């Protein structure tokens, strides 16, 4: 979930409030809590791609410290003023997301007049103007993002948020009326804070020897979450026992913005979790999904008699047993690689192999004496696949393209006409970038399977 700084990468419908008071108050707070900002950087709305950001006052070299945040200044379930009660009752706060303790900490601190983090909250985006698709009208979300996987992800989020709020959060607030004012007892506010945590929180990575532990709880990191995102980022967050340090990893010329990144995120993930998409072709981490059940559907289209259909379902059940496929899984295709290489190669192989060969393969529980080159599957390998594999993959791509409301040419026409594109709403532009990036990957697969 949340791992690195989260902020819109491209200019959106943010407010144009240039009031210097929040920044001055925040900088004074930084001094009080020991948050060390390099004199070479400035917090500003000027010269940034979206909202508040950080800009280089002077040239910065790789390895230079941009700022250091002492752990005491982090806002988490462990540092907030109600940490004691959150710890005592942590058993009742268990949830699927794992975010409830932090969200309760935020609900308490944001309504407390004397909260130590008040100057930090002043730099938060306006909660009522968050651009996540969960805040779009359902009809608009489905119309603009049909086929991308986002509407389905949002629906799951909304169900989980509602359940979490009424079964865990509200009962906790009702049990502690002295800690939570009536104005923060709102499902809508809770949804907004979930989106904020999704987009702005950090999650400290586990050490190698801790791999089997539960993931660390999310936390809010003042200053670090001011940075905007760019795939080709020029700064990186480092964790140490006493503080979190943002360090330059590329030369940053004077006047240029400082960017963090939050990993390899496809555009559909960006818009779902953070409310923006990178314009094509900037997002080199973009992907397109082919639902696993779509490949099964494509294979079923090639069956002619009941016996063939029954055998195909037997093959599918065997793939499920091998944990190569699942009813809700997807094969993930990037611009230059198949991210689910083993799963896709094995699925094409099992669904396309002759019946006798499948029987032998099944008897060996999917083990073979020799792993063939066919078991690897890269983008460049696709034209070399067996004809039956290519055909099944092609049919699956065609079925996937049918799930979108528009075709690639429609998207290209919108993107190629600057006046028409500029006239689109912010949401229409972001959704278009998501759809177009996915369709470009899928159409390349059509070329490779021709």
UniProtKB/Swiss-Prot annotation:
Annotated stretches, region: Disordered: 1-20
Residues bearing the modification N6-methylated lysine: 40, 156, 349
InterPro entries: N-lys_methylase_SETD6, Rubisco_LSMT_subst-bd, Rubisco_LSMT_subst-bd_sf, SET_dom, SET_dom_sf, SETD3_SETD6_MTase, SETD6_SET
Name used for this protein in its record: N-lysine methyltransferase SETD6
Protein's cellular compartments: Nucleus
Substrates-to-products reaction catalysed: L-lysyl-[protein] + S-adenosyl-L-methionine = N(6)-methyl-L-lysyl-[protein] + S-adenosyl-L-homocysteine + H(+); L-lysyl(8)-[histone H2AZ] + S-adenosyl-L-methionine = N(6)-methyl-L-lysyl(8)-[histone H2AZ] + S-adenosyl-L-homocysteine + H(+)
Biased composition (Basic residues): 1-10
């Amino acid at each position: 979930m949340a791992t690195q700084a989260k902020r819109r990468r491209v200019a959106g419908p943010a407010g144009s409030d240039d009031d210097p008071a929040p920044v001055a108050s925040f900088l004074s707070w930084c001094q009080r809590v020991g948050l060390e900002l390099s004199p070479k950087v400035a917090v500003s709305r000027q010269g940034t791609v979206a909202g508040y950001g950080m800009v280089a006052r002077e040239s910065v070299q790789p390895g230079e410290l941009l700022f250091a945040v002492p752990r005491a200044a982090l806002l988490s379930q462990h540092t907030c003023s109600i940490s004691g009660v959150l710890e005592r009752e942590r058993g009742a706060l268990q949830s699927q997301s794992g975010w409830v303790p932090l969200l309760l900490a935020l609900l308490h601190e944001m309504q407390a007049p004397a909260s130590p983090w008040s100057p930090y909250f002043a730099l938060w985006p306006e909660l009522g103007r968050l651009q996540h698709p969960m805040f779009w009208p359902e009809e608009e979300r489905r119309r603009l993002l049909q086929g991308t996987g986002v509407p389905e992800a949002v629906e799951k989020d909304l169900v989980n948020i509602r359940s979490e709020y009424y079964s865990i959060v509200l009962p906790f607030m009702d049990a502690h009326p002295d800690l939570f004012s009536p104005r923060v007892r709102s499902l809508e506010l809770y949804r907004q804070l979930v989106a904020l945590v999704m987009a702005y929180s950090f999650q400290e990575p586990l050490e190698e020897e801790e791999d089997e532990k539960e993931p660390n709880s999310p936390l809010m990191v003042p200053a670090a979450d001011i940075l905007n995102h760019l795939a080709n980022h020029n700064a990186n967050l480092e964790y140490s026992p006493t503080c979190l340090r943002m360090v330059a990893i590329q030369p940053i010329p004077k006047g240029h913005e400082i960017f963090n990144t939050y990993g390899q995120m496809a555009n559909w993930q960006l818009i779902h979790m953070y409310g923006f998409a990178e314009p094509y072709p900037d997002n080199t981490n973009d992907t397109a999904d082919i639902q696993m059940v779509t490949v099964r559907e494509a294979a079923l289209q090639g069956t002619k008699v009941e016996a063939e259909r029954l055998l195909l379902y037997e093959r599918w059940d065997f793939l499920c047993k091998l944990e190569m496929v699942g009813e809700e899984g997807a094969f993930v295709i990037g611009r230059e690689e198949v991210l689910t290489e083993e799963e896709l190669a094995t699925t094409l192989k099992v669904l396309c192999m002759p019946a006798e060969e499948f029987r032998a393969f099944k008897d060996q529980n999917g083990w073979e004496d020799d792993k063939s080159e066919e078991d690897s599957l890269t983008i460049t390998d696709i034209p070399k696949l067996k004809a039956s594999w290519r055909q099944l993959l092609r049919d699956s791509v065609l079925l996937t393209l049918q799930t979108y409301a528009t075709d690639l040419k429609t998207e290209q026409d919108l993107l190629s006409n600057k006046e028409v594109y500029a006239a689109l709403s912010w949401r229409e532009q972001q959704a278009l970038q998501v759809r177009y990036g996915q369709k470009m990957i899928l159409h390349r697969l059509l070329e490779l399977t021709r």
